[in-house]
Amino acid sequence: MGKEDEKESGRDKMKSFGSIRSIFMHADGVDWILMALGLIGAVGDGFITPVVVFIFNTLLNNLGTSSSNNKTFMQTISKNVVALLYVACGSWVICFLEGYCWTRTGERQAARMREKYLRAVLRQDVGYFDLHVTSTSDVITSISSDSLVIQDFLSEKLPNFLMNASAFVASYIVSFILMWRLTIVGFPFIILLLVPGLMYGRALVSISRKIHEQYNEAGSIAEQAISSVRTVYAFGSENKMIGKFSTALRGSVKLGLRQGLAKGITIGSNGVTHAIWAFLTWYGSRLVMNHGSKGGTVFVVISCITYGGVSLGQSLSNLKYFSEAFVAWERILEVIKRVPDIDSNKKEGQILERMKGEVEFNHVKFTYLSRPETTIFDDLCLKIPAGKTVALVGGSGSGKSTVISLLQRFYDPIAGEILIDGVSIDKLQVNWLRSQMGLVSQEPVLFATSITENILFGKEDASLDEVVEAAKASNAHTFISQFPLGYKTQVGERGVQMSGGQKQRIAIARAIIKSPKILLLDEATSALDSESERVVQESLDNASIGRTTIVIAHRLSTIRNADVICVIHNGQIVETGSHEELLKRIDGQYTSLVSLQQMENEESNVNINVSVTKDQVMSLSKDFKYSQHNSIGSTSSSIVTNVSDLIPNDNQPLVPSFTRLMVMNRPEWKHALYGCLSAALVGVLQPVSAYSAGSVISVFFLTSHDQIKEKTRIYVLLFVGLAIFSFLVNISQHYGFAYMGEYLTKRIREQMLSKILTFEVNWFDIDDNSSGAICSRLAKDANVVRSMVGDRMSLLVQTISAVIIACIIGLVIAWRLAIVMISVQPLIVVCFYTQRVLLKSLSEKASKAQDESSKLAAEAVSNIRTITAFSSQERIIKLLKKVQEGPRRESVHRSWLAGIVLGTSRSLITCTSALNFWYGGRLIADGKIVSKAFFEIFLIFVTTGRVIADAGTMTTDLARGLDAVGSVFAVLDRCTTIEPKNPDGYVAEKIKGQITFLNVDFAYPTRPDVVIFENFSIEIDEGKSTAIVGTSGSGKSTIIGLIERFYDPLKGTVKIDGRDIRSYHLRSLRKYISLVSQEPMLFAGTIRENIMYGGTSDKIDESEIIEAAKAANAHDFITSLSNGYDTNCGDKGVQLSGGQKQRIAIARAVLKNPSVLLLDEATSALDSKSERVVQDALERVMVGRTSIMIAHRLSTIQNCDMIVVLGKGKIVESGTHSSLLEKGPTGTYFSLAGIQRTLC
């Protein structure tokens, strides 16, 4: 109950966070100064127009009196022109402050916020991520889309709001000064303008939150698909993923339409300003007739009140951005403010002066928060003496890895305590505690950076010599040195550029470099080949000397030298003792496990006594090292020249095509039609209302009261009609464009993901195309396009319509004045266009930084356990700062440019008003136009100029939108080098499984200097089982990659059933091929859903799923879970143990009933008992199928029809298990078998 109460109180606190001040919590002293100056600029910007209108007051009254003569009239003109020019100069300074200060502080605060957010995410305990299965996509969204929303709010939307709000206030100040009676009467009408905006803001918060939840669900699906793209491709699950993605997006479309309707009602309600003008015109006429008020002053006051109302409407339209910023900020602040139960930032806690390393679990009870109904430990008691090696063995899912997690304080026990040197670990400083431990996990986690940087995660201040020594100790130095870039070689996202054994050795080096007091080895050698395992095991044995070591292993041969071996069963220690002591217990569980593994090894010997001397072992090791080095050195020159052909040029300039975007919107043409028509009619409203307002002024100077009453009645009815018309067309406009934007966004997201899932695997190997960066583009680009189509396009149509109508009316009324006024408008347009072009050129690096930040954040969350174990949070933050260094410098230039362009634009508007004012006065003085025509045209073009200026404020959004359009079509137009849906491809009704590699040359496109195969040939008979063995990194897994056609060879061909694999329809071919990878990739969903990914049809019976699970020895543990097959696997299967994940992956492969079965270390993560049963199941499944098995453990491949030993990128020898052993000590396979026997 306590935790629930805490959660509730936490929610209550969160409600108070969404205040305007909380958004500025990342501002420092400089930012507050910038915001203060920016506030002055924004408020001053709002005062400019009311001040200009105030200047008009004298002119209008002079124009309305018959006593005005040419001399006094021109003096008045000159006086006002000079005043306007002063205002123009002042407006440049004010608007420069507004543009520079807000842009600068927005980018500064956003960068600081991203850092604090990522720091807060990395601060959370592991249990937080267990409960948030979409945590990776959450972080990608917040670090990219949410931070961008807040940055836009600070840089542009907030100053716009302040400017409009101050314009509203300034207008009423001027009005009150000039005519307080009319102002007081008009003031209560503010309520009519406030209520719709406030209601819209409240509704939008709720809708925005729901839209984010829908997007987040869809983003999680996309992130899973992209990060596990090999699994998706192998099982032909592209359409399933796209279908789930599309379904998740449907809810957001409906919510988006509700949002558009709400916006239309709100903006339409602002048409009440026309009704207000109607009333004030009527009341003003009464003041003129009954109180002798001056007509010009009445008109100026009404204009100010109306302008103030329009400005208020503009500011209320910005409530959308306030709401979006608050919603985005709540999501970010929720994480920033969350203090985890196990806080790595907490500096309090005891630090032991001299740590011995004695570990004790005292009556520990534990369950995972994500599975509270499943008890892992009920009363665990375990004592590990200092400096001793203790091995934990037991069935998969028995809780072995949980011991390590508890010791590192990933979690805290529900009851009991864990002691180190007699001190409870919850009393020790968390970071110091973890710094005393070195962890090598079952599934090695590497970061998308260089090998050196990955090893330095273990010890930040280590020297290069220490890095090399650690690599040597883990047997990694040799293969690292063979790379052209050596230790600077990039490992790729999730270490994809390295083989499993290479990744594991780098991970071991990372653990060794910190010289820990306690060494934690969770299946540390499971991915290594026999020769590497022997050397690494010796290294680990040496590293264990003098320090407490906890070893988890399924292969009992690796733990026989442990001081103490503990057998865990059902969360209890059932047996304890040394290897020899436990073997004395004939009926003991450990004895049965050893017997089971010995049976496998004895069978592998087939009654042949294998005896290998240490010299032969070392000789073999040297031969393999030499052969690898030799093959690389001798073949690189002949192949490198061809690799570039396989690397597509994705650096083509992005060419946005708005026409193509509209073609994509073709299905919504009806909504587009009435949306555009409505927007055009909204545009007509502006010049028509301005024309009417200009005409009203002449009414106030009429001498006949009857005429004043009659004409006032006409204009009042006209304004009321405009109010009703505005309400209706705004609803139609915003709903129509919302419909267009939402469905276009959904279509873009679907098509982008669909297209991305056709790209060759190598595209995903490139650093810029990490899952984080791609998901960021999916979220950000589509959102920007929606904003451009839904909001900006409607404003563009509106503006064009207003300009056309204004020009027509102006030319009809007074063509001379109209031509001058029209000719100066392009200056404003050019100024804003310059802003767009220059800001676009400077925004590219900032956009790249966003992608880099998203990529880094996604990788950090995906590997949170490794980061937590090594206390590497600060290292990740340093990497984040590094990727933002360049964009931070560019932001300074962007800020200066924003200030200069905005200041110039605003001052130009005032200067053009001065010019129009002067020239119009000259025409009146010369008798070429009447004053009424001047008022009409002047107001039409002043208000139209404001419309153009408002449209100009969207140039940044348009620039960003066009960039996003270019980015979208860059993805949609990209031609993959391996087309999975080639319509001309051969669709086989059945595959026999005859596989041929003929003279194949291959090197990975991202590492063209490292040759894997040269002139490689192999024949794999249909229906037969073939095992591939060899040293780690020798190309075993590459064979599977080529068969799955993840890659194409540089030369030669890969054939299936005698047909070049490139001639097949790839997706149909993959239906007949099943893959079980070395590192099983599961998706967030239930166990049932994960197994069903192996189905080739949409309808799969429950009995088929259960049979597949039974074949993989998964059924029993699944049914033992409280939710059975409906148990949620968590993000990437985090809720399951390694063995459980592997068995589900095997069940998924079995369900496919393939013709070709590919097993890449399929049983490496299983304990002995499970491995035996699963191995039997696999052997049954392999019967009658072409099976290719990659294994380091030779006992698992002894029954294969053919065993192939790789070396030098060629086949060293091949044959059956017995025939290869008959070659004796001269045979490579014989030597490998001997090495494994010496390890047993």
Curated annotation (Swiss-Prot):
Glycosylated residues, chain numbering: 70, 542, 609, 642, 769, 1015
Entry keywords, A to Z: ATP-binding, Glycoprotein, Membrane, Nucleotide-binding, Repeat, Transmembrane, Transmembrane helix, Transport
Membrane topology qualifier: Multi-pass membrane protein
Coiled coil: none
PROSITE patterns (UniProt xref): ABC_TM1F (PS50929), ABC_TRANSPORTER_1 (PS00211), ABC_TRANSPORTER_2 (PS50893)
Binding-site residues, ATP 1: 394-401
Residue ranges of every copy of the ABC transmembrane type-1 domain listed in the record: 35-324, 672-960
SMART domains: AAA
Annotated family: Belongs to the ABC transporter superfamily. ABCB family. Multidrug resistance exporter (TC 3.A.1.201) subfamily.
Protein name: ABC transporter B family member 17
Organism: Arabidopsis thaliana (Mouse-ear cress)
